[in-house]
Amino acid sequence: MTTLIHVLGSNLPHHNQTVLTFFNDVICQEMAPSSKPHFMVVSDDAQLADAYPQLKIDVFANKQAIANSVIQRAKADRRTRFFFHGQFNAPIWLALLFGQIKSHQFWWHIWGA
């Protein structure tokens, strides 16, 4: 089975809350996934995951920390896929440019508030 990880790579609470709430309250209720959707999120709130019990959330203190973790996961298993929601994280873009994250692993969606 392919691993899919959603990445919110910047500390933008108003954007991140919208995405997390939608997945927690709508996707998980309507689709009843077999496992919790996995998110990696930059946030000042270390307890962020408590607000979204239907999701598996890894919280990172800053953009570089999340980029390092994404790169490590991407290199460890090239079957892992990442869905980047509104990506404002230069280290992640550079990792894609220089092949640390392969293009087949990188899905991106831009959105606004």
PLM feature segments, named:
Residues 48-50, 90-93:
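Short active-site-adjacent helix-start/loop capping segments
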Residues 36-74:
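Conserved nucleotide-sugar phosphate-binding/catalytic loop shared by glycosyltransferases and other
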Residues 1-49, 77, 102:
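N-terminal subdomain of nucleotide-sugar transferases
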